[in-house]
Structure formats: structure tokens, C-alpha cells
Amino acid sequence: MTLTLLPAVDVADGRAVRLVQGEAGSETSYGDPREAALTWQRDGAEWIHLVDLDAAFGRGSNRELIAEVVRAVDVAVELSGGIRDDASLDAALATGAARVNIGTAALEDPDWVRRAIDRVGDRIAVGLDVRGTTLSARGWTRDGGELFDVLARLDADGCARYVVTDVRRDGTLTGPNVELLRSVTAATSRPVVASGGVATLDDLTAIAVVPGVEGAIIGKALYAGAFTLPEALAVAGNIGNIGNGCAGAVGR
């Protein structure tokens, strides 16, 4: 079994950037998003996590550039940022992205999200951006309800997958919140993609052995050179040999 790794390409004002704890204004620029995505593809990525931060913060969009990035690569793309109604959902899917993440709308417009899940099925994942057990909305600028109440509702609505981000650790290189991941996977049978805080190769192992976690988004660690994507993929590919079968649920 392997842990699916999704190197991140976050786009703001036409540039690939990384934020610290999701704070607008904390961006560090890493250049052309297309080149970033192609670099991860050349390094062996099978998925890329692509985010339109301007759309997420409600300050515009990079729609044409995002579509160019998706077209430029030959790997699967998970697309996130500002998907809150039929028009933005259809536009996101029209880029050719394999999967889209819905965040704020899952908290503010549950009826629409229920209909979207009915219509699109497992091409939708819901992003659960968490501080403690409180969800964050509108680009992490507003509180959005209690994690486990929302999780139960989304499970009942048929959500196929969750992307769980500890906002306090995102972009900080302080390690993942494994206890948060364990609490979420204990509350749902749906697969979880972990996000936030990965700093070392050992962090990937710690994530992978949580039953129910199928993938991990990696951002700052790759851009800062903490390790390379080929190194991370080698670790992820060896997860099944770790422990006494404790990673048996990974990648389901």
C-alpha cells in the first residue's frame, strides 16, 4: 500500500506562493505556477493540489491561469479555491481537474453542497480547515462551525472524501496534527487527505499509519528544500512495510 502525495501549487496574483497559517499577506513567492506544477510532474507526482487563493479569499480569481496549469500537466489535479455555486463548480470541472475541493460552501450553503454531491459524486471532496475543533471559512478568515457536527452532516449527504487541514500548522514546518487526523478518521469511514505542517520524511510515515488516511498534501517542505519529492515518494511507496500491517487502511 502507498500513501498518495499531492505536492501543492497555491496561486495568488498569478504567482505560485506559500502562506503561513493561511494568513493573507504572509505569501512567499515561488514563481510561475505552471513551472511549479511541471516540476512536480517531472519529479514523479501523480497528483497535484492546485489552489486559487485569490478566489478562496474572495478577492478575484486566477481562473484562466488555473486552467492553463491543469492543461499543462499530464497528472491528476485536485482543484480548490472559491468553489461556492454551480457556475464556479462547473468552471472548475471544465478545466479537466480530476477532483475539486469545496470548502466555505460546505459550511455556508449545505443544501447546495448536497445537490452538488448528488450531481458530481466522488469528483467532489470537502475541505475541512480546522483550528482546534472549529472550522474556518472564507479563506480561513471566519469561523464556520464545529468540526464533528459538520462531518456528520456531510457523511449523511454522501461526501466521498475529506481534505483535513490544521490551519495553525499550515506553512509552518512544525509537523502534522496526527491527533486531529485520528479523531476525524475515527468519526468517518470516508478516506481523508491530510494537510498542514509536514516538515520531515518521518512526518509522512506518521500520517500514513493513521487508518483511513489515503494521502498527504505537501507544500512548504518541498519549496523550502526540507526534502525532495522523489525522496518523499520513496518513503510513501514503502509505507506498507512499516509496522505490523498498521497501514492497512491507507490508500483505500
Curated annotation (Swiss-Prot):
Keyword Heme: no
Keyword line: Amino-acid biosynthesis, Cytoplasm, Histidine biosynthesis, Isomerase
GO-annotated biological processes: L-histidine biosynthetic process; L-tryptophan biosynthetic process
Active site: 10 (proton acceptor), 129 (proton donor)
One GO MF term: phosphoribosylanthranilate isomerase activity
Catalysed reactions listed for this entry: 1-(5-phospho-beta-D-ribosyl)-5-[(5-phospho-beta-D-ribosylamino)methylideneamino]imidazole-4-carboxamide = 5-[(5-phospho-1-deoxy-D-ribulos-1-ylimino)methylamino]-1-(5-phospho-beta-D-ribosyl)imidazole-4-carboxamide
UniProt subcellular location: Cytoplasm
EC numbers: 5.3.1.16
Family matches, as NCBIfam families: hisA-trpF
GO cellular component labels: cytoplasm
Pathway per the UniProt entry: Amino-acid biosynthesis; L-histidine biosynthesis; L-histidine from 5-phospho-alpha-D-ribose 1-diphosphate: step 4/9
Gene3D superfamilies per record: Aldolase class I
TM stretches of this protein: none
Species assigned in the record: Frankia casuarinae (strain DSM 45818 / CECT 9043 / HFP020203 / CcI3)
Predominant location: cytoplasm
The protein's name in its UniProt record: 1-(5-phosphoribosyl)-5-[(5-phosphoribosylamino)methylideneamino] imidazole-4-carboxamide isomerase
InterPro entries: Aldolase_TIM (IPR013785), His_biosynth (IPR006062), HisA/PriA_Actinobacteria (IPR010188), Isoase_HisA-like (IPR044524), Isoase_HisA-like_bact (IPR023016), RibuloseP-bd_barrel (IPR011060)
Family stated for the protein in its record: Belongs to the HisA/HisF family.
Lineage: Bacteria, Bacillati, Actinomycetota, Actinomycetes, Frankiales
Keyword field contains Isomerase: yes
